[in-house]
Amino acid sequence: MKIIFVCSGNTCRSPLAESIAKSLLPHDSIASRGLFAVEGQAISKESLELIHKYDLPEPSRAQAFHIDDLDADIILTMTQAHKDLIFSMYGRQSNVFTLNEYVGDTQEIDDPFGGSFDVYEQTYTKIYDLVDKIKFKHE
């Protein structure tokens, strides 16, 4: 199954989700994108520190969301606003969900950009908990 995680810049939330998912869902094809990503930009220092702290696979550098990405089996956005933007750009898509919506949770993933390391760690924990639920949804 091909899963793409989407946030704004593809430097904080979606790369964390990509790394966590690569660890928890090793048989799936995992990627991340940003709706406003600068192609090739490095992920945030704090996100990279968390990836190393938890010994996760490193994500790819920032990549923008493109129409070809709609071919993924599942596209999981960090917020309703990201989902709405994809719909406004490409029309309604049956494979696009917010991450929390997909696993039956209510918490959106706020952007930690500019926050302290603790804020990034809280974001990591939220994303980990939600991505972990994907495992059970696919069993």
Swiss-Prot record:
The keyword Electron transport does not apply. Its EC number is 3.1.3.48. Keywords: Hydrolase, Protein phosphatase. InterPro entries: LMW_PTPase, Ptyr_pPase, Ptyr_pPase_sf, Tyr_phospatase_low_mol_wt. It catalyses: O-phospho-L-tyrosyl-[protein] + H2O = L-tyrosyl-[protein] + phosphate. The active site is at 7 (nucleophile), 13, 111 (proton donor). CDD domains: LMWPAP. The keyword Thylakoid does not apply. One of its GO terms (molecular function) is protein tyrosine phosphatase activity. Belongs to the low molecular weight phosphotyrosine protein phosphatase family. Dephosphorylates the phosphotyrosine-containing proteins. This is Low molecular weight protein-tyrosine-phosphatase PtpB. It comes from Staphylococcus epidermidis (strain ATCC 35984 / DSM 28319 / BCRC 17069 / CCUG 31568 / BM 3577 / RP62A).
